[in-house]
Amino acid sequence: ATVGKTIRCRAAVAWEAGKPLSMEEVEVAPPQAGEVRIKIVATGICHTDAYTLSGSDPEGVFPSVLGHEGAGIVESVGEGVTKFKSGDAVIPLYVPQCGECKFCKNPKTNLCQKIRLTQGKGLMPNGTSRFSCNGQVLFHFMGSSTFSEYTVVAEISLAKVHEKAPLDKVCLLGCAISTGYGAALNTAKVEAGSTCAVFGLGALGLAVIMGCQAAGASRIIAIDVNPDKFRIAKEFGATDLVNPKDHSKPVEQVLVEMTDGGVDYSFECVGNIAVMRAALEACHKGWGTSVIIGVAAAGQEISTRPFQLVTGRTWKGTAFGGYKSVESVPKLVEEYMNKKVKVDEFVTHTLPFEKIHEGFDLMGAGKSIRTVLNY
């Protein structure tokens, strides 16, 4: 009944940086060629949403519909779309996979660039938006915009998942869990018996711990200044817990002493450039590798002494856990359904969509791991 028509629905609109989201009735236009319109069933709230809303994101455009960790059901498809049909269970992807660009053809990366330029400007690949509110155009966000009852995404930015997958759980595989899990398995390539340090114990850090454990790490040191995070870190597989506030010396020194010279792998899951440096310098001379996952504010730069790298440490970064998205997310959903990957344990709060502000408050206060909003 809605096919080919504009849908009026609720969305949480970010009118401007630094202002709270506002629940509005918006119009969502039908999908154009190569696009898919989705009814969102559930979405997680990620620090990246708050980061963009705060105005720290150099690519943040307003007014916009934020949200990038969702799952839903295909409502209709645009011209030429063959891989999806109405009723399919799907997860929108902020890292697409066109399969044709030089990035997609290179096994070393997952960073498809096919629609990068328009996505960064908050537009669909043809340079226009599908959202409006009272006649005003709203921008898209990260190619996903899940804080709306309906959204439109490019067909290359969508993964079809198992029809029986609980969408209010697997939505988290659209960002946090895949990113952290893959950082350990794909980017760092953690080996059995290794020692790992994870800085920051939000959803991302916990997913890294899960990845390190899956890889057979013998020691996983979890680091956070909020001791409330330690219990769940232990449940996820952390073997040691370190609160930098409990020590007079720098945390990297504490770790080097604890581990007879440093860790094999470290992961920065905060987005703080001082922590990024500490994570690198906690690595073992000769072979230690540090992976940056956290997103720092616009214009910030990382630093260390070149000698740290000259003496055999490696500094890397990762996006979406190195997973080529369209092919990997359905497999991760299957792994979850086969009890190989934890998802439920990340969900500490569930709220109805209209209580989105409460979800942001819980995250800001460090009281939640993930809040899932149900529509």
From Swiss-Prot:
Ranges in a coiled coil: none
Residues given in the record as Zn(2+) 2 binding sites: C98, C101, C104, C112
Gene Ontology MF: a single term: zinc ion binding
Residues annotated with N-acetylalanine modification: A1
Keyword DNA repair annotated: no
Needed co-factor(s): Zn(2+)
InterPro entries associated with the record: ADH-like_C, ADH-like_N, ADH_3, ADH_Zn_CS, GroES-like_sf, NAD(P)-bd_dom_sf, PKS_ER
Protein name: Alcohol dehydrogenase class-3 chain L
